[in-house]
Amino acid sequence: MAGQRAPHLHLAELSASQFLDVWRHFDADGNGYIEGKELENFFQELESARKGTGVDSKRDSLGDKMKEFMHKYDKNADGKIEMAELAQILPTEENFLLCFRQHVGSSSEFMEAWRRYDTDRSGYIEANELKGFLSDLLKKANRPYDEAKLQEYTQTILRMFDMNGDGKLGLSEMSRLLPVQENFLLKFQGMKLSSEEFNAIFAFYDKDGSGFIDEHELDALLKDLYEKNKKEMSIQQLTNYRRSIMNLSDGGKLYRKELEVVLCSEPPL
């Protein structure tokens, strides 16, 4: 090991909690990625750990090996390593993060799962709801678990993604479990509406005051939102965003509360 920089990076199997410790050590600024100097530090530590296991790490220059490494693991080629990409590199116990993402691999599936587990329509998944989510995930993946392990996974996910420490996960926090290319909610960052702005735009499209809009009205609303923010959106993107958001709807009726969860600045990131 190189000094005391990352005591858990020893390439033995990591528990979920140990994996989180490694992640937080290298994601020093807490932005959800390892990039730049963080990535360089991680790679140097990884090479040092590999030397300790007898893996030859002298064959190429550090720069060459970093390029090869990023080509293999940086799946969306953005020059950053995100949490699930790191889970593929480190021998994480049962690789629970990848297991999670396989369960909600697309934004549409994610929104379906959100609606199913946000049972009280609060706009949050609380610890007990998250526990049910993870239990179903593990059953679907045929992964054996006991109550203690389920509790550890629940608490670890909360520690990873509960950015404001309130013991519950908002939609924007929970969506960080999605691969970046599937996380359509990231597309709305910088376009979040205040409650007043949201109420005004919803009222404009809910012309009959029914309290809900349909998919055609949602189409128009999303186009309007993008145009006002001078952002471009393809027909395919619009279709995907609409489909994902409509998974929150009740029989094709998208109520104010469901859309507010997606478009408003709260819950805070």
Swiss-Prot record:
Q: Which Gene3D superfamilies does the record associate with it?
A: EF-hand (1.10.238.10)
Pfam families named in the record: EF-hand_1, EF-hand_7
* Ligand binding (Ca(2+) 4): D162, N164, D166, K168, E173
Q: Does the keyword Metal-binding apply?
A: yes
* Residue numbers binding Ca(2+) 2: D74, N76, D78, K80, E85
Chief subcellular location equals other
Q: Which GO terms describe its molecular function?
A: calcium ion binding involved in regulation of presynaptic cytosolic calcium ion concentration
Q: Can you say what this protein is called?
A: Calretinin
Q: Which species is this record about?
A: Gallus gallus
List the top taxonomic levels of the source. Answer: Eukaryota, Metazoa, Chordata, Craniata, Vertebrata
Gene encoding this chain?
CALB2
